[in-house]
């Protein structure tokens, strides 16, 4: 796109701001619809944003205001995934297994953060920088497939007691 690192940094800043603003509302949403569903919604939104990012970066030669909206949505989608992932791992573990599974979670997360810049960078060097968004969308879509196999990890709603049990009767 010819924007250089400044334009890319601004897009990353917008995505980070979108995530920060979304963390608490995403937690509340997950309490209503479940962590798994929230993560899956985040994955779908993230893949769509990456594909839209591809279309926008191949259509325009400079950063357009719509791209900032897309990157803010990237942040929201990332928050939906990030806020709920570790709590799902913790919810699935029993006592002594918690450390082991937390270790797996972080080992695989960090391994992906080390490997993907190498693979994506090699693809961008061999093909073009435009391969980055489809590459990201592909792996986000693959993460959706893995989430379809998750059967545990959603918090169980606790039964309300006393007067709290009558709060939702008006709705």
Q: Which residues does each predicted region cover?
A:
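Loop-to-transmembrane helix entry
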Residues: 1-17, 65-66
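Loop-to-transmembrane helix entry/capping segments in MFS-fold secondary transporters
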Residues: 5-6, 93-105
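Helix-to-loop junctions at the C-terminal end of transmembrane segments
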Residues: 21-35, 124
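Multi-pass alpha-helical transporter architecture, strongest
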Residues: 136-170
């Amino acid at each position: 796109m010819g924007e250089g690192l400044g334009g890319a940094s601004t897009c990353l800043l917008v995505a980070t701001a979108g995530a920060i603003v979304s963390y608490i509302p995403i937690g509340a949403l997950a309490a209503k619809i479940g962590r798994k569903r929230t993560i899956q919604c985040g994955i779908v939104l993230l893949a769509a944003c990456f594909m839209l990012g591809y279309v926008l970066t191949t259509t325009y030669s400079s950063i357009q205001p719509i791209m900032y909206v897309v990157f803010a949505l990237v942040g929201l989608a990332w928050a939906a995934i990030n806020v709920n992932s570790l709590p799902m791992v913790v919810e699935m573990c029993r006592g002594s297994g918690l450390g082991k599974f937390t270790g797996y979670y972080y080992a695989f997360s960090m391994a992906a953060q080390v490997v993907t810049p190498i693979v994506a960078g090699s693809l961008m060097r061999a093909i073009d920088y435009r391969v980055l968004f489809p590459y990201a969308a592909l792996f986000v879509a693959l993460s959706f497939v893995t989430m379809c196999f998750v059967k545990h990890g959603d918090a169980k709603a606790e039964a309300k007691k006393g007067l709290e049990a009558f709060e939702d009767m008006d709705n």
